[in-house]
């Protein structure tokens, strides 16, 4: 768990410094999370630099105005405090601004992947919410409404 928190801290620091890549020490779980980030388009990619030391280089992704797609990465479930959600309640979670990583009996999945899998099952599956990633994808119309609200 500490390795993963170090990876999240390195990504956040790299994004604040506008770095193109950061180097971290990886593990099986780190590779799994990074491949999910890459599939969702949150990072450009990652590459194993040194196999014996498990060093991984993460290539960060920015918008054209050099703002990052990632806003925050929260580790929700820790050793003593775990957050579980039932399969029936998955439909109520808003995936527009946040990306949820849920650990189920099928492994670590994003919320949309779990919803698709639940459509095929008789009884919907829930799981443990491990991580929440806040994404900087704000609709321009919503930004205008927020500005107008603050001007009044």
Curated annotation (Swiss-Prot):
GO aspect biological process, one term: translation
Keywords: Mitochondrion, Ribonucleoprotein, Ribosomal protein
Gene3D superfamilies: 3.30.1370.30
Pfam families: Ribosomal_S8
Subcellular location: Mitochondrion
Keyword Ribonucleoprotein: yes
Disulphide linkage map: none
Gene Ontology cellular-component annotations: mitochondrion; ribonucleoprotein complex; ribosome
Domain of life: Eukaryota
Ribonucleoprotein in keyword set: yes
Molecular function via GO: structural constituent of ribosome
Family: Belongs to the universal ribosomal protein uS8 family.
Protein name: Small ribosomal subunit protein uS8m
Lineage of origin: Eukaryota, Amoebozoa, Evosea, Eumycetozoa, Dictyostelia
Gene: mrps8
């Amino acid at each position: 768990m500490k390795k993963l928190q170090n990876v999240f801290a390195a990504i956040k620091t790299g994004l604040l410094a506008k770095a193109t890549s950061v180097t971290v020490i990886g593990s099986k779980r780190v590779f799994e999370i990074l491949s999910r980030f890459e599939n969702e388009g949150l990072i450009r990619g990652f590459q194993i630099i040194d196999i014996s030391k498990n060093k991984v280089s993460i290539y960060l992704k920015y918008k054209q105005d050099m703002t990052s797609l990632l806003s925050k990465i929260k580790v929700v479930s820790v050793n003593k405090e775990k957050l579980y959600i039932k399969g029936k309640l998955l439909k109520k979670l808003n995936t527009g601004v946040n990306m949820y990583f849920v650990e189920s009996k099928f492994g670590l999945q994003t919320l949309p992947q779990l919803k698709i899998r639940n459509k095929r099952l008789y009884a919907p599956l829930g799981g443990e919410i491990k991580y929440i990633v806040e994404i900087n994808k704000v609709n321009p119309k919503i930004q205008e409404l927020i500005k107008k609200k603050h001007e009044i």
